Amino acid sequence: MGSDSTLSLPSSSPPCNNRSSVPPTFTTRIFSDVAGDIIVVVDGESFLLHKFPLVARSGKMRKMVRDLKDSSSMIELRDFPGGPSTFELTMKFCYGINFDITAFNVVSLRCAAGYLEMTEDYKEQNLIFRAENYLDQIVFRSFHESVLVLCSCETQEIAETYEIPDRCVEAIAMNACRKQLVSGLSEELKGRDCLEMWTEELSALGIDYYVQVVSAMARLSVRSESIVASLVHYAKTSLKGIIDRNCQEQRKIVEAMVNLLPNDEKGSYSLSIIPLGFLFGMLKVGTIIDIEISCRLELERRIGHQLETASLDDLLIPSVQNEDSMYDVDTVHRILTFFLERIEEEDDECGYDSDSTGQHSSLLKVGRIMDAYLVEIAPDPYLSLHKFTAIIETLPEHSRIVDDGIYRAIDMYLKAHPLLTEEERKKLCNFIDCKKLSQEASNHVAQNDRLPVQMVVRVLYTEQLRLKKALSGDSEEGSWVLPSGVQSRAVSPRDTYAALRRENRELKLEISRMRVRVSELEKEHNLMKHEMMEKSGNNGGTFLTSLSKGIGRIATFGGETRQKVNRKSRSVSERKSSRSGR
């Protein structure tokens, strides 16, 4: 076609009631002395034209003119591709008036030419030939032009008849693959090619065509980094300003994004090129708009396979179901399960002789994250005990070096749920390994009234054993453990003696604390006994007798320990005197 700009021509008024959008040049440029002899109506808009230019290039117009009755000079074209504006361009072509074929009108022109049967059978280099030539020579050789044409196909369903969308999709994928090969030779171009061109260009497509394009790219082995960058940008653009729970289009977009996520060569989900924040964002949006269960599980599985890189904010997924709890604990529990499955699979693949340092490091990181998560959700008064303990039970014991975090979470849960039974409190406290508590946490336990008495006694007993072990020097590999949990080694007899003196003082201080605690328990016991006697008379005698024996054992335990410590202190003093005598 010519290179002139598209003409904007005034309309004329033919001698009929219908308005004509065809300018006088249509009737005077070629046939200056012949008036228009046919009226074509397109979507209610009339065009006064000449039969000869139309029938010379259009098979459909030739048939319709031939079928006209002698008294009629009007033809009506229904559902014309592109409407009156596109019909005007086709008439300009028939009259030999130059205009530009562009990426914005080529689809309409190609569909209109097919509708009017403007083939080579009627005229050489007819409109179908010109439109197809533009597609082949200009559009399909350019990534940008192909995207523009594919966008215009969304409003032209008839374009599917001529396979324009399919050809655009293949052209986009081929151009992307070609540019990848070029950019692969230059590290400078590689990042810009992946993160700028595709992310910006493809975000203009509707979700149906976008899915086809990305699928074609994956089939042609376009870099996964480029595909992921495009997915992230497309999701941010198309899901902006959400969220409507009943929006089918948004649900369709999220589900399509999930299905397009790439896997590595082994089909694994642990591709680090997929940002974890993007996966969590899709999961949170998907939870709100209620995407399919299979898509939710896919997102949870992918998140679980790189859970060690997550943050606390990522895990705080609001609950949108008909529940009273603030957070979606069930989803986090499933994510944690997927993470542990990954660790187990890696252990099975590596075997017993392999170095499992990486897996253990990941497990420790997740342990810290989950402890922080438990602390965050524990104050929720509507959080059920079952869901709270499910998170704790799922993590193995070796996922924590210290249990201070889990103790803090349990303590906060007890504070927010004062109506728990004694058995439920005991069940919670059984998750705490007293040997893994720091000195600070152990001191807090000793003064914590929310904990069962058995828990307090267990912690105090563990602390005593730890101190006794430190004083006796009986520890593995010649080392001993301080109450703070820090391991040390004896450097010289003087250092050992000084350390023993410090430990002796700490032991005496701990015993003093124990006495205070036992005294408080005895006061509580007397108060309970008094109240029970008033309410139940002699019926509560058996229970009180049992409780008295229990507290008596606590006092006895403290007394025996005190005697042993005094004997140990005297032993230390004797060794000191012996050294001085030497």
UniProtKB/Swiss-Prot annotation:
Amino acid composition bias (Basic and acidic residues), ranges on this chain: 571-582
Pathway linked to the protein: Protein modification; protein ubiquitination
Annotated ranges, domain NPH3: 196-466
Domain of life: Eukaryota
UniProt entry keywords in alphabetical sequence: Phosphoprotein, Ubl conjugation pathway
InterPro entries from the UniProt entry: BTB/POZ_dom (IPR000210), NPH3/RPT2-like (IPR043454), NPH3_dom (IPR027356), SKP1/BTB/POZ_sf (IPR011333)
GO biological process, one term: protein ubiquitination
Phosphotyrosine: residues carrying this PTM: 407
Task of the protein: May act as a substrate-specific adapter of an E3 ubiquitin-protein ligase complex (CUL3-RBX1-BTB) which mediates the ubiquitination and subsequent proteasomal degradation of target proteins.
PANTHER family attached to this UniProt entry: OS12G0117600 PROTEIN (PTHR32370)
Domain remark text: The BTB/POZ domain mediates the interaction with some component of ubiquitin ligase complexes.
Entry's family note: Belongs to the NPH3 family.
Protein known as: Putative BTB/POZ domain-containing protein At3g08660
Species the sequence originates in: Arabidopsis thaliana (Mouse-ear cress)
